[in-house]
């Protein structure tokens, strides 16, 4: 789950990380009042969306008057910001962050992720701040310095000092960086984060370190014990179908094809998309209904898949292990009848009571095609999507 920049900076403040004074505003009037609270300009105004590349898209601007702040807010609030990280429709701008401008001398990068290879939280620091870290990793990987946290001892001040020296910091900056490192590591661990980035972490012309931007991603599997982070969720920034799926504990990711896929099990779902591609089709989504493929969940899954106007056929691929295939077939028949599916549905059942399930599908009288194998199902659904 992603957080907005202003939410990230609220958390930074709780953990003692320095950031510019700022306020999130939902109206042009609030934006003007925020400037008065901050004090004399210049100010920086930023559209709050879950995407990078805001500056290049006009979503970040340095302004010198309250009139300019109002004009920026009037121009963006209620609109959609399109960046290289969004789709063509962009993401809605519901808040504007107004904060004090900072005199920048140097831009650095500091971030942390969970490294699955080492099974550790790994910090990354670089002198190449203000640009995408992926670009730095590709073009100048030697400029990225890494530091893994020991899960037994946690973050240690000496690790912060070591990174500070590698970044060329001196004097009081070493102490400031170490404090930021320790605070960020504590935030990462206590809040069950999956990713945190300060890009850029700037050195001001006065020689102080300031967190100029912030990006946080919380581990969705840990939100049950992070109630305050759950309340920060902004559904408006999510794909509506993905948000609907999350309510039913369905794992859904929208893609750009025309064949809807409904599968039980993430591995089987990925394999299903592969064989659809191999057969000449284009998957419209990844959807894992999980082990509990009940009629209710299958019904909601159909609703989600069919809300995509690009879908021309649906491929249901179910392996019956603990759950019997005849019961799954009953759920599919009930869901198709209830939702009113008007595109071909190809179903492949394998496992416990698969033959009985296939007979039920064939006798249902609905627009359901029972396939005999995985390859047969893939070929049938690709042909159906092409209108053959």
Curated annotation (Swiss-Prot):
Q: What is its EC number?
A: 6.2.1.5
- Metal-binding recorded as keyword: yes
Residue limits of the ATP-grasp domain? 9-244
Q: What InterPro entries does the database record attribute to this sequence? A: ATP-grasp, ATP-grasp_succ-CoA_synth-type, ATP_grasp_subdomain_1, Succ-CoA_synthase_bsu_CS, SUCC_ACL_C, Succ_CoA_ligase-like_bsu, Succinyl-CoA_synth-like
Q: Where does Mg(2+) bind?
A: 199, 213
Cofactor(s) recorded in Swiss-Prot or TrEMBL: Mg(2+)
Annotated residues for binding of ATP: 46, 53-55, 99, 102, 107
Provide one Gene Ontology cellular component.
cytosol
Which Pfam family name is an example for this entry?
Answer: Ligase_CoA
Q: What are the binding positions for substrate in this chain?
A: 264, 321-323
What does the entry's cofactor note say about binding and number? Binds 1 Mg(2+) ion per subunit.
Keyword annotations from UniProtKB, A to Z: ATP-binding, Ligase, Magnesium, Metal-binding, Nucleotide-binding, Tricarboxylic acid cycle
Output one GO BP term.
tricarboxylic acid cycle
Metabolic or biological pathway: Carbohydrate metabolism; tricarboxylic acid cycle; succinate from succinyl-CoA (ligase route): step 1/1
Reaction(s) catalysed by this chain's protein: succinate + ATP + CoA = succinyl-CoA + ADP + phosphate; GTP + succinate + CoA = succinyl-CoA + GDP + phosphate
Its quaternary organisation is: Heterotetramer of two alpha and two beta subunits.
Purpose? Succinyl-CoA synthetase functions in the citric acid cycle (TCA), coupling the hydrolysis of succinyl-CoA to the synthesis of either ATP or GTP and thus represents the only step of substrate-level phosphorylation in the TCA. The beta subunit provides nucleotide specificity of the enzyme and binds the substrate succinate, while the binding sites for coenzyme A and phosphate are found in the alpha subunit.
In Swiss-Prot or TrEMBL terms, this protein is called: Succinate--CoA ligase [ADP-forming] subunit beta
Species the sequence originates in: Erwinia tasmaniensis (strain DSM 17950 / CFBP 7177 / CIP 109463 / NCPPB 4357 / Et1/99)
Q: Give the encoding gene's name.
A: sucC
């Amino acid at each position: 789950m992603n957080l907005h920049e202003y939410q990230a900076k609220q958390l930074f403040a709780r953990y003692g990380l320095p950031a510019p004074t700022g306020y999130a505003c939902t109206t042009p009037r609030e934006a003007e009042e925020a400037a008065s609270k901050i004090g004399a300009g210049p100010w920086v105004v930023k559209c709050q969306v879950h995407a990078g590349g805001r500056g290049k898209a006009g979503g970040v601007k340095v302004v010198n008057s309250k009139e300019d702040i109002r004009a920026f807010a009037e121009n963006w609030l209620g609109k959609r910001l399109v960046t290289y990280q969004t789709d063509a429709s962009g993401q809605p701008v519901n808040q504007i962050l107004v904060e004090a401008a900072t005199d920048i001398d140097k831009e650095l990068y500091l971030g942390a992720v969970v490294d699955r290879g080492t099974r550790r939280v790994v910090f990354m620091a670089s002198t190449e701040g203000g640009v995408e870290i992926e670009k730095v990793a590709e073009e100048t990987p030697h400029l990225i310095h890494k530091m893994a946290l020991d899960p037994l001892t946690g973050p240690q001040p000496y690790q912060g000092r070591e990174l500070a020296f590698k970044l060329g910091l001196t004097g009081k900056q070493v102490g400031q960086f170490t404090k930021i490192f320790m605070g960020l590591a504590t935030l990462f661990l206590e809040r069950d984060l999956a990713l945190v980035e300060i890009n850029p972490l700037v050195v001001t012309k006065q020689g102080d370190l300031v967190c100029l931007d912030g990006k946080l991603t919380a581990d969705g599997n840990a939100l049950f014990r992070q109630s305050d982070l759950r309340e920060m969720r902004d559904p408006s920034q999510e794909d509506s179908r993905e948000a609907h799926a999350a309510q039913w504990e369905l794992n859904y990711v929208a893609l750009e094809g025309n064949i809807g896929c409904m599968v039980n099990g993430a591995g089987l779902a990925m394999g299903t998309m592969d064989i659809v591609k191999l057969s000449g089709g284009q998957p419209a989504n990844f959807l894992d209904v999980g082990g509990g493929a009940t009629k209710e969940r299958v019904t909601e899954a159909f609703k989600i898949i069919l809300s995509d106007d690009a879908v021309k056929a649906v491929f249901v691929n179910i392996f019956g292990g603990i759950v019997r295939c005849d019961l799954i077939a009953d759920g599919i028949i009930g869901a198709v009848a209830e939702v009113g599916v008007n595109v071909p549905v190809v179903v492949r059942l394998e496992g416990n009571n698969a033959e009985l399930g296939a007979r039920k599908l064939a006798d249902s009288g609905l627009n359901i095609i029972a396939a005999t194998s995985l390859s047969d199902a893939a070929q049938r659904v690709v042909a159906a999507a092409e209108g053959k």
